[in-house]
Design a protein with these regions (language model features):
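Catalytic core of Fe(II)/2-oxoglutarate
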Residues: 123-189
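Intrinsically disordered, low-complexity peptide-like regions
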Residues: 12-15, 30, 82, 96, ...
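Non-heme Fe(II)/2-oxoglutarate
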Residues: 1-77
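Structured loops at beta-to-helix junctions and adjacent beta-edge loops in soluble globular domains
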Residues: 25-27, 36, 88, 121, ...
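Catalytic core of non-heme Fe(II) oxygenases with the double-stranded beta-helix
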Residues: 68-147
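A ubiquitous, low-specificity "background" feature that marks scattered single residues
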Residues: 38, 104-106, 178
Length: 189
């Protein structure tokens, strides 16, 4: 993957434009449209109403990234929505504390979309932190090749203090009891 092909992730918590992505499967089948339509301002939606195909579909990138098919094979017949590769720049990459509150269907309950992270490239100096409702926080060190479910509706932040860019393959998967059981088994290994 060429870093120049990654699109800046438009958001007010993308400090210094150091968070970028590519779409493998997403809205309109466009490699550089990394957000959901719900994240766009109403004026943009009106202006682009006729231009955009809002269906979720694969982009040409899907066939070019073997890790995607490997991960999709692991997931088997789980229904999935968006698939993205998100990069957090080395040394300066930071996502300020935020929630993904526009993802109203996110979660681990039946029929909700569980956001799974599969680190493709990372380093020990990448720090992910998530806050709970009681104000306590948890830090996660996600290793390459591991699978993580993260509830992005909770406040969270990510910082890359390392000397290597961080790349995560992120897939939104339709949740059910089988997925919850599978995630529990995966976490026990």
């Amino acid at each position: 993957l060429n870093i120049d092909d990654f699109a800046n992730h438009y958001s007010n918590y993308n400090k210094g434009n150091t968070w970028k992505g590519m779409v493998v499967r997403g809205y309109g089948g466009l490699v550089d449209f990394i957000v959901k339509p719900a994240e766009m301002v109403n004026s943009w939606k009106k202006e682009n109403k006729e231009k955009m195909d809002w269906k979720v579909k694969d982009t040409p990138l899907r066939k070019q990234v073997p890790a995607v098919e490997k991960f999709a094979d692991i997931l088997g017949d789980y229904e999935h929505e968006r698939i993205r590769i998100l990069m957090l720049k080395e040394g300066e990459g930071e996502l300020e504390r935020h929630t993904d509150r526009q993802d109203v269907e996110a979660g681990i309950g039946d029929g909700q979309w569980a956001r799974l992270h599969f680190p493709l490239q990372t380093n020990p100096k990448v720090e992910f932190k998530q806050w709970n409702a009681d104000g306590t926080s948890t830090k996660c060190k996600m290793g390459e090749g591991e699978l993580w479910y993260l509830d992005m509706r909770k406040p969270h932040t990510a910082v890359n203090f390392g000397e290597q860019d961080r790349y995560h393959l992120i897939i939104d998967v339709k949740s059910d009891q089988r997925l919850r059981d599978w995630l529990v088994r995966s976490s026990e290994k």
